[in-house]
């Protein structure tokens, strides 16, 4: 699961993934983070 701090970061992540980027690369690019659980931390719910 990916967690992003802002809607803009989420959009960047989604665009990157749609373009064929891997999850770790897109998370780093957008400022999002990949977690192993199912619930994002407070403030990372985008």
Swiss-Prot record:
- GO CC terms in record: extracellular region
Location in the cell: Secreted
Keyword terms: Disulfide bond, Plant defense, Secreted, Toxin
Cross-referenced InterPro entries: Thionin, Thionin-like_sf
Transmembrane residue ranges: none
Q: Which GO terms describe its molecular function?
A: toxin activity
Pfam families registered for this protein in UniProt: Thionin
**Gene Ontology annotations of biological process type:** defense response
Kindly indicate whether the keyword Magnesium belongs to this entry: no
Q: Which cysteines are joined by disulfide bonds?
A: 3-40, 4-32, 16-26
Blocked carboxyl end (His) modifications at: 46
Q: Which superkingdom heads the taxonomic lineage of this protein's source?
A: Eukaryota
* UniProt-listed Gene3D superfamilies: Thionin-like
The question of whether Transmembrane is a record keyword is answered with: no
Q: Which family does it belong to?
A: Belongs to the plant thionin (TC 1.C.44) family.
- Annotated function: Thionins are small plant proteins which are toxic to animal cells. They seem to exert their toxic effect at the level of the cell membrane. Their precise function is not known.
List the protein's name: Phoratoxin
Taxonomic classification: Eukaryota, Viridiplantae, Streptophyta, Embryophyta, Tracheophyta
